[in-house]
Amino acid sequence: MKKAVILFNLGGPDKLENVEPFLFNLFNDPAILNLPGLLRYPLAKLIANRRAPTAKKIYKELGGGSPILKLTKEQATALELKLNSDDNLSDYKCFIVMRCWHPRAENVVKEVINYNPDELILMPLYPQYSAATSGSSIKEWNDICIKNNFKVKTSTICCYPTD
């Protein structure tokens, strides 16, 4: 049985010139700014433009970009190895989706369709549930799956344990 594990994270700009587009994606999310698109889009542009200079300074201190994709790839590799070594009946493959930067759900859904799994396991890497993080990521994923007529048994691992 083939199982696809979809790891969700926020994402982050990979280089300084991508800080403003990343911020725009963040603030253009209806779960962040709950406004009609005609208002949300220009407001997201304005906020991203105003916050970009300060955010660029912070990302510059981090080496010029966010480490989140690299770290999430390391987590995905370790999880895939562990799952495949513990379960001889299933073949697991981990995929990464970033909500506000690359790789985006739109592209990853196509990769998952090509993998042709029997089951999907959605696993947000946010430490707790929030409509603006886990909720938004899962909604975007489900919307894109519907758009691509991709239907497969799906389960969701929501949040980290509290104890």
Feature map (PLM): residue ranges:
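Active-site-proximal alpha-helix that buttresses catalytic centers in soluble enzyme cores
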Residues: 1-163
